[in-house]
Amino acid sequence: MGKQATPRALPENEAKAVARMLRVSPQKLNLVAQMIRGKKVDTALAELQFSRKRISTEVKKCLESAIANAENNHDLDVDDLVVSQAFVGKALVLKRFHARARGRGARILKPFSNLTIVVREVRQAEAA
């Protein structure tokens, strides 16, 4: 009588992870997401490890989660994984008040972002 299971949205050779409500603007997060797009996961992890961007640690956690999902939930080979998609979405924006001179006030916007990373298993024969 319950709901039927929805069909899998991703192909069988893909897995994904989503990080929501990251406290960074989408533009800044997209700089880091753009850096790992299309690369092998070990190369992407190394680049995130030595990146000087503050948000790169959160992106690294999300990528590690996608790798773990691929290995544990979908039985994919970790050595053949490639970051097929890494895209950023806008979440909410907190609006704060900053008191200024002469009784005025200024608005401070604190944006949040969502990050989705999709990894795909690419066999060596397909890559060559």
UniProtKB/Swiss-Prot annotation:
Keywords: Ribonucleoprotein, Ribosomal protein, RNA-binding, rRNA-binding. The keyword Ribonucleoprotein applies. Pfam families: Ribosomal_L22. It comes from the Bacteria. CDD domains: Ribosomal_L22. GO terms for cellular component: cytosolic large ribosomal subunit. One of its GO terms (biological process) is translation. GO terms for molecular function: rRNA binding; structural constituent of ribosome. This protein binds specifically to 23S rRNA; its binding is stimulated by other ribosomal proteins, e.g. L4, L17, and L20. It is important during the early stages of 50S assembly. It makes multiple contacts with different domains of the 23S rRNA in the assembled 50S subunit and ribosome. The globular domain of the protein is located near the polypeptide exit tunnel on the outside of the subunit, while an extended beta-hairpin is found that lines the wall of the exit tunnel in the center of the 70S ribosome. Belongs to the universal ribosomal protein uL22 family. NCBIfam families: rplV_bact. Part of the 50S ribosomal subunit. This is Large ribosomal subunit protein uL22. The lineage of its organism: Bacteria, Pseudomonadati, Pseudomonadota, Alphaproteobacteria, Hyphomicrobiales. The gene is rplV.
